[in-house]
Amino acid sequence: MRSLLLFTFSACVLLARALLAGGASSGGGDTGPGNRRREREALAAQKIEVLVLLPRDDSYLFSLARVRPAIEYALRSVEGNGTGRKLLPPGTRFQVAYEDSDCGNRALFSLVDRVAAARGAKPDLILGPVCEYAAAPVARLASHWDLPMLSAGALAAGFQHKDTEYSHLTRVAPAYAKMGEMMLALFRHHHWSRAALLYSDDKLERNCYFTLEGVHEVFQEEGLHTSAYNFDETKDLDLDDIVRYIQGSERVVIMCASGDTIRRIMLAVHRHGMTSGDYAFFNIELFNSSSYGDGSWKRGDKHDFEAKQAYSSLQTVTLLRTAKPEFEKFSMEVKSSVEKQGLNEEDYVNMFVEGFHDAILLYVLALHEVLRAGYSKKDGGKIIQQTWNRTFEGIAGQVSIDANGDRYGDFSVVAMTDTEAGTQEVIGDYFGKEGRFKMRSNVKYPWGSLKLRIDETRIVEHTNSSPCKSCGLEESAVTGIVVGALLGAGLLMAFYFFRKKYRITIERRNHQEESNIGKHRELREDSIRSHFSVA
């Protein structure tokens, strides 16, 4: 009996172990069928479908012709012997489709049309768009469809709200708000609290509007005062009105416009005596292109001398450039590819070109981690979360993405350090991840010290101190004005004497006529009386 009980107990223990083992293998453990399927997917070769939405119009700094070579360079790196081969399953390939975004609704239509044509099959990754009005609807749909979207654009302040409609967007280029943080650090360094925002606004793509919107929002949050003035530089500029606005607003002016427009404004304020240290002018040039102001005063025209003097009061804000050996190779390959398409320019590698290259690297890093965790390439939300709050090595140096999916921005301030030669150098740098602004100690500052002292409360007496006596007018124009004034005075005097003589003549004639009329009246009256009396 005792042996029977022992046998029964042993059998129950074995059965329980078997049941537990079976439950572990079939119930939600790490080795269940669902997880084994995910592991197989993670180890299997991946076909990553990428949709690139950028404009074909080469007037844009981020056109397909400019950015495509950078994307293909990155893909060769990750598919070849680079980091991608170590991170992704063997045999993984990227299939890329390039569509014209036209910087408008065509971007959204292209995405919807491709999904419809593929019977609902969606891309695994969206790169772009850049233009704000093109990116907004695509980002909303990407969030709805659970698609990761990486862009070196969509830089406006509105895209930083990632809690709802932009939840699947990562910005791999510094947003305008990051530049606003840099300006805030610069103002704190100089102990300034007020700024005038002066910008061009074409009411279409509104690049400068969105640029200075980032400054305005950051300043407003920190209690700094701003006033704003906008103009359309595609039309005739009222430079006098712009000067009056500056004189009546703030002493520190932040501007965004084309290089030629900035030069015209600086010449105007210089001719009104506003470049002698009472004002500080800043020009935003994030994209290293003349479209947004190239910071150069020289044009080879008769105004170069004045412009050089005026630019001694202008500082230019641009991206901090770092370079490593691989970047030089990358730049040469991009330049070669772009030139083959008939584009010849000085700056082949700009912020957008770098950004989309780094977007591929960031996506590969995130996808690797998601696959290792047992998820698939279709888990867009998981992938996009892995792109946030991390630092990785980009083509030009370290790239840091904050916890909100926006890249930290490193910026430099360029100023004229030699007023005789007109030489401009970097005088200070801002490091976005650290939130630190630092002036360089090995350069000569145009104002002579580390801090530019601007008294924001002192009233300035504005005088026209143009070095040219005619205030910018040609000598012949001045001569014409003087001769015209003399002729006008002569005509007025001639008219006065003619009018006086004519008046005397008229008065004499009227007097004679009145005398004759009186005589005729007397004769007629005498005749009537004579005849009446006779009757």
Swiss-Prot record:
KW Aminoacyl-tRNA synthetase (keyword) present: no
UniProtKB keywords: Cell membrane, Disulfide bond, Glycoprotein, Membrane, Receptor, Signal, Transmembrane, Transmembrane helix
Extracellular topological intervals: 41-477
Propeptide feature ranges: 27-40
Residues that span the membrane, as ranges: 478-498
Compartment(s) of residence: Cell membrane
Residues on Cytoplasmic side: 499-535
One of the Pfam families matching this protein, by short name: ANF_receptor
A cellular component annotation (GO) from this entry: plasma membrane
Cysteines paired by S-S bonds: C103-C131, C208-C256
Principal localisation: membrane
Glycosylation sites: N81, N288, N389
Signal peptide: 1-26
Highest taxon of source: Eukaryota
Membrane topology, from the record: Single-pass type I membrane protein
One BP term from GO: signal transduction
Protein's job: Receptor for the natriuretic peptide hormones, binding with similar affinities atrial natriuretic peptide NPPA/ANP, brain natriuretic peptide NPPB/BNP, and C-type natriuretic peptide NPPC/CNP. May function as a clearance receptor for NPPA, NPPB and NPPC, regulating their local concentrations and effects. Acts as a regulator of osteoblast differentiation and bone growth by binding to its ligand osteocrin, thereby preventing binding between NPR3/NPR-C and natriuretic peptides, leading to increase cGMP production.
Xref: PANTHER family: ATRIAL NATRIURETIC PEPTIDE RECEPTOR 3 (PTHR44755:SF1), NATRIURETIC PEPTIDE RECEPTOR 3-RELATED (PTHR44755)
Other observations noted: Has low affinity for peptide hormones in the absence of bound chloride.
Similarity comment: Belongs to the ANF receptor family.
Assembly, per entry: Homodimer; disulfide-linked. Interacts with OSTN.
Protein name in the entry: Atrial natriuretic peptide receptor 3
Record organism: Rattus norvegicus
